[in-house]
Swiss-Prot record:
Organism: Conus textile
One Gene Ontology molecular-function label: toxin activity
UniProt note on tissues of expression: Expressed by the venom duct.
Keywords of this entry: Calcium channel impairing toxin, Cleavage on pair of basic residues, Disulfide bond, Ion channel impairing toxin, Knottin, Neurotoxin, Presynaptic neurotoxin, Secreted, Signal, Toxin, Voltage-gated calcium channel impairing toxin
Localization annotation: Secreted
Pfam families: Conotoxin
Family: Belongs to the conotoxin O1 superfamily.
Taxonomic superkingdom: Eukaryota
Pro-piece positions: 23-52
InterPro entries xref list: Conotoxin, Conotoxin_omega-typ_CS
Protein name: Omega-conotoxin-like TxMKLT1-0211
Domains as described in the record: The presence of a 'disulfide through disulfide knot' structurally defines this protein as a knottin.
Function recorded in the entry: Omega-conotoxins act at presynaptic membranes, they bind and block voltage-gated calcium channels (Cav).
Length: 76
């Protein structure tokens, strides 16, 4: 029983630690995450998940599509 409780506490601690280290260090980081998610729900065409090409300056190779259609080691 004690081992089970320790395992539950450890999992909760590691989950919280992962969340804390993944959020940008800002006093209103949670608010920013909420606003970004809310914006993407209202404007699904602006969502990063719908983007199928890479912006300029992103590294690329022959198999990756750039938004401009030009790839010379980086998207132009």
């Amino acid at each position: 029983m004690k081992l089970t409780c320790m395992m539950i506490v450890a999992v909760l601690f590691l989950t919280a630690w992962t969340f804390v280290t993944a959020v940008p260090h800002s006093s209103n980081a949670l608010e920013n995450l909420y606003l970004k998610a809310h914006h993407e729900m209202n404007n699904p065409e602006d969502s990063e998940l719908n983007k199928r090409c890479y912006d300029g300056g992103t590294s690329c190779d022959s198999g990756i599509q750039c938004c401009s259609g030009w790839c010379i080691f980086v998207c132009l």
